[in-house]
Amino acid sequence: MPPADPVTLSFKTTGGVTSEHGNMNRPNSTQDTCTPAPSNAASCPFATQAPQPAQAPQPEQSEQTASTAWPPGPAPGLMGWGLLRRMSRDLLGTLAQWRGEHGDAIHLRIWPEHQVVVTDPELVRELLVGQHDALVRWEHGISVFAQLHGHSVLVSEGQPWRSKRQALLPAFSPKAVQAQIPALAAAAQAALQAWPQQSEDFPMEQALTALAMDVIMRLMFSGAIGEDARSAEQAIREVSHAAHSEFYWPLRWPDAMPWKRRKRRALAWLRSFIDRQVRLRLAQADAHWPEDLLSRLLRLHRGDAQAWTLQAVRDECMTAFLAGHETVASSLTWWSWCMATHPEAQQQVADEIQEQLQGRTPTAQDLPALRQLGWSLQEAMRLYPAAPVLISRRCTRPVQLGPWRLPARTLFMIAPGLMQRDARWFPQPDVFQPQRFADADKDRAPAAPRGSWMPFGTGPRVCLGQHLASTEMTVVAAMVLQRLRLSVPEGASAPRPVLQVTLRPSTPLRLRLQSRRGAQTG
């Protein structure tokens, strides 16, 4: 039985929803997200859907009824397997349709579970911030991730999670990240020097992924990724494909099955790759260890070998390597597509970069001045979040969510990909408009609840590496546009987003490159 196909994401948005927060109707735009100026460029893959009225709880509902009823949702059919099949084929498209039909809280009865999908920012914050101590991550989802991540901070719970996060936090603080900017810039410069100055059909996604891998390798292991980049990318794609196909079904076939040979090989390659880095470092004298993440983890091991076993060190290295480059590579890939399909916005950003940097490599002092670049990255992450759906949470005790009193063991699914394309919070939600973040900076934007833009999550489990990811994306993007003009190749079609742990194009993105006259190349 071969694994299921990767999930296609429709991102069909709904507008004009009336919620418990009042009537927030705004018309949806029918304009394309990424319609490029050149006639040869393809239209955006995300089409809007006509709004449908939500069915929120009625105000006259009695307190007793509200405390016991589930939110509205689709009919489960036979044990809910039909719902599960629809979600596995088109997750966000299906969730968007259900939100249009049932509102911002959707009850799914998939035997033996009760699951509530939450797409309202205030309700999401109520859960992930206000009631975080009542939530644990979904056991099945964690078991899928644990195949590769072991017992790292990504999958741990309770006191083990708190201890690991506290130990790792200093390495990802804003101050620590700022000190790493020269290494980020050096990695970007080395990669860009190998890129052609002119190409009609450049493998942009592959190049950005290799660059992001190289950066995290330098920060973690003080060495370049080198010839391992291509093998690592292939192994990660295979493991991600397998993990995503296993994510939706409660039972999975053992890895020993013949059709899982590629998954076994990919897992073995990645584990061997990380183990090799650890063994090489342990072979060096402690006094010669560089100041990087691996050295920090090994010092924790030397200080408390029971709490920080060598396997725990390997687990954290695996998570840092995978999470540390996947979000950046995914986000930069979609940003490059948005830039290629919006030449005027691209030129404005490039002009700002030239004005601020004058051909120099960016430093920590330069980054705050690159505001238009920052807005373009924020808008690309709004349209194409690397994690459009968060790992489901289970409540360990009854929780109050809006008007509903939900019992212990209820599962909650959070969908940032829907909230970030909601016309109530983002007018013309399918249109690439970096200026909306400029207006937010100037307090001119319509009041949008906190959490309506959350590409890194929110609450105590917010992404540990968000400062590193944001800084790396800014440095790399600035250096790309210093040198190159991006456009869509002749006859190319728009990329189709698929979710395989992170959001990626179904086929690797390729762009046309042109050198910018007078650009820095050294």
Describe the predicted segments one by one.
Residues L83-G103, S272, R360-G402:
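Conserved cytochrome P450 K-helix E-x-x-R motif and the immediately C-terminal K′/meander segment
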Residues T327-A340, V476:
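Short, small-residue alpha-helix embedded
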Residues S67-L78, I181, A185, Q234-E238, ...:
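Cytochrome P450 I-helix active-site segment
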